[in-house]
Amino acid sequence: MKIFSKIIIGFLFLSFILSSCNNTTTYAEQLKAEKELIADYIKRNNIKVVTEEPKVWDENVYLLTESGLYFHLINVGDSAAPAEVLDTNDLVVPRFYQYTLNAKADTISNWNTVDYPYPTTFNYLDDSQACAAWHEAVSYMKYNNSRAKFIVKSKIGFEDASTAVTPYIYDMKIKFQK
């Protein structure tokens, strides 16, 4: 009986030791990898990062905001109609591509949702309907038919990106309804 007890205790001890050793990465390591991936993407694409909003958006100039959003305005949109400026709770209808930042980018979403019976929409500044990064990007876009590219860190992205600590780049064009 003593031998049997020793075998059981030994087995329990061994299983405890083996279960405490795992090869998963820590959250801090995932954040570091995310930061490195973004830095590598910026370098590979010759992106110039600025901290003040440029008056003229040159090619490959991205604004780094306090939240960590990298934003580049491609097209101002319909700025000739000042009455058509985006306002709180306006319904935003985005068309967007979502890519990974890997050297060989994967297209995660390739949506032209405007043509869908139920397009992707959200109310501007209603945080329950879109991620913080989308609201911030749209705040810089302001006008119908505005187009921008932006890099979204996991912390300000959608929940699935946050859980996986995965940054994405979006190429987005917006329309909105008052």
PLM features: residue spans?
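A beta-strand/beta-hairpin structural motif
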Residues: 32, 74-77, 101-178
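Alpha-helical transmembrane segments
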Residues: 11-15
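A generic structural micro-feature
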Residues: 86-91, 164-168
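Short acidic-hydrophobic surface loop/beta-edge motif
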Residues: 8, 62-66, 148-150
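Start-of-domain signal
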Residues: 22-90
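C-terminal motif of bacterial Sec signal peptides marking the signal peptidase cleavage site
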Residues: 17-20
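Bacterial N-terminal signal peptides that target proteins for export
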Residues: 1-9
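A short beta-strand signature
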Residues: 88-103
